[in-house]
Amino acid sequence: MQSGHYNRRQSRRQRISSNTTDSPRHTHGTRYRSTNWYTHPPQILSNSETLVAVQELLNSEMDQDSSSDASDDFPGYALHHSTYNGSEQNTSTSRHENRIFKLTEREANEEININTDAIDDEGEAEEGEAEEDAIDDEGEAEEGEAEEDAIDDEGEAEEGEAEEDAIDDEGEAEEGEAEEGEAEEGEAEEDAIDDEGEAEEDAAEEDAIDDEGEAEEDYFSVSQVCSRDADEVYFTLDPEISYSTDLRIAKVMEPAVSKELNVSKRCVEPVTLTGSMLAHNGFDESWFAMRECTRREYITVQGLYDPIHLRYQFDTSRMTPPQILRTIPALPNMTLGELLLIFPIEFMAQPISIERILVEDVFLDRRASSKTHKYGPRWNSVYALPYNAGKMYVQHIPGFYDVSLRAVGQGTAIWHHMILSTAACAISNRISHGDGLGFLLDAAIRISANCIFLGRNDNFGVGDPCWLEDHLAGLPREAVPDVLQVTQLVLPNRGPTVAIMRGFFGALAYWPELRIAISEPSTSLVRYATGHMELAEWFLFSRTHSLKPQFTPTEREMLASFFTLYVTLGGGMLNWICRATAMYLAAPYHSRSAYIAVCESLPYYYIPVNSDLLCDLEVLLLGEVDLPTVCESYATIAHELTGYEAVRTAATNFMIEFADCYKESETDLMVSAYLGAVLLLQRVLGHANLLLLLLSGAALYGGCSIYIPRGILDAYNTLMLAASPLYAHQTLTSFWKDRDDAMQTLGIRPTTDVLPKEQDRIVQASPIEMNFRFVGLETIYPREQPIPSVDLAENLMQYRNEILGLDWKSVAMHLLRKY
């Protein structure tokens, strides 16, 4: 079966076959590290100077050559930073000069946006010079060919070749490569190639040669573009391949088929399931036939690498300090060497340039921005997002994605103050990304042990009132490693650093250093899901406050459904992490067949997160809803749906990546996907916690009737207990107190009044693309039997300490007034 994410196998073969340089071998996978390192002394700017520089650059337009109008034909640009050659000490400013690469029209149509890294200027032949001379092309462009033949003795320059090296004493012009789009492992080879006149077989065809026949200065047309991963490593993108992350539908038992086919109709006989592809069940063709998969999820490269019109004029060559890896408390009897043999994370702990951190911060902000928000780097900033101080009006505005710009700005500022800025202040310059990696690994082992301890394996039938509660599934006894066999719940590790990383509603996913450290494609997947969830939370914060915590009836019903789905999704991710951890820590004599649920990618192409329970709930809760109409009328629901779809897609692709890397023995990329899933799980838990607190406020403080499926609060409580080493649950009373304190600090006052028309500025939020499709419209759950539901306010009283907090008596008074 063809893997959908980045066409990984093909791109790796291309990187291996095309690499002819002497660059040192990278420590993991088949990739190669760039030979460039930032060695020149730093120029340290103050925070205010940095912010001013970034703001000016964000608002400025990109410089363009007066002879070309690239903005009419090419929507995206990639920023190229020239860097030092490690063997030279040249301090010429041309080595730090930013160059902008112009994308071809074909690549722009394929939505391939790139962020190219520095190209080495190999200037050994010309000491102190790194300037490239753009020579006008003489001749006609021969479409579709990349001419690499030697220039004849008369010195006639053929079209498509940029002469970059000096002409030798005999007067022969050495040939300069013009393979537009081919960047080999981060190095655009611009040296002279031999003039034997033989054209290489693997030359990339020039799809878009400049119509005017001019090689414009400061631009370099490419047809085989390059991108980079988190460790300054190039990998090549082929324009002939569609770079999209798909959950493809292939015919069962024919994994080599890449054509999208429908799975056969589900069985008509009743089926009793004991769980979703448990380790001891094995694969059964009839199990796949139970569902008709008609949905395809995707992440386009445009969603992963947004173009950034930004050029830093200040020195950003500083690096983060060297990272120190330590043993983890969850495995006290294991030395660091033994730990790294099992979990090879040393390549993730390398220093990261400040420039990469700033760019990654802006990437996430662009992902989370919409028409109602301006973007800019926020994690390392000290200023608050723009908002209107004064009264906060939270009434719903009907219309086509209509929202109040005042309320959205205020809600975003409150969210930023409560979550992002507080987490950034606690983490920046105090905690290194090496400590973050150690925390994720330690927490993953602890929550896996808790999952096994709390997993019941009682095999409740589908439709049983407890079927939602029993969504944590333990492992068979023979598949549980000794280190995961515990007799009591494993508590979180102690210390202020751990407390910081467990808090703030799972804010570690917003930490740019940590996202970069886990390396691609995990960096892009976390950014993709986190950006959509962040935008949804902005709109959620703009709809309520302590004086008016109610939502509209439609919003309450939909948010209750999304809360149920997020809890189920989190349980599925926790089950997968538990099995992956057990496979890592299992003794060599353990049969790998016990961990087939994480070593085979086939199930995940059919069912998201390999959870039939999640697929059933999607149909039962959202199948009868007119989603396009609801999303057009409620921008909050629209972005909540988009966020859920993004999380489901990213989580499934983590699991596919892990299984594919296992088959290819890519141990470094396996642990990258493993830690990426742990990081995303923390953000999922934080978002589910936030949804419950908002719904609980509407039920207890606002007196609204909200109904949730029976057993979902039990499942939520079990999930939070198991994941407590990774995420610290926020209680209802502490959340609303912190929110009121944040509003007071920002000068925002809650009010129940209606926004005056003279202050009412209605804008349209960014419409969403309705790509959401259901898997298996005929559910395994009996459709004629409705899901039993309970009142949220009544059910909350069973969790006075766990969910409501210590001040639950004051909350109970509101419940008594309601009845």
From Swiss-Prot:
Residues 1-42, 58-221 are annotated as: Disordered. Keywords: Host cytoplasm, Host nucleus, Late protein, Repeat, RNA-binding, Transcription, Transcription regulation, Virion, Virion tegument. Phosphorylated by US3. This phosphorylation is required for proper nuclear localization. Residues 62-72, 118-219 have a biased composition (Acidic residues). Sequence repeats lie at residues 117-132, 133-148, 149-164, 165-190, 191-206, 207-218. Residues 117-218 are annotated as: 6 X 16 AA approximate tandem repeats. A motif (Nuclear localization signal) lies at residues 11-31. Pfam families: Herpes_UL47 (PF03362). A motif (Nuclear export signal) lies at residues 785-807. Expressed in late in the infection. The nuclear export signal is CRM1-dependent. This is Tegument protein UL47 homolog. It comes from Varicella-zoster virus (strain Dumas).
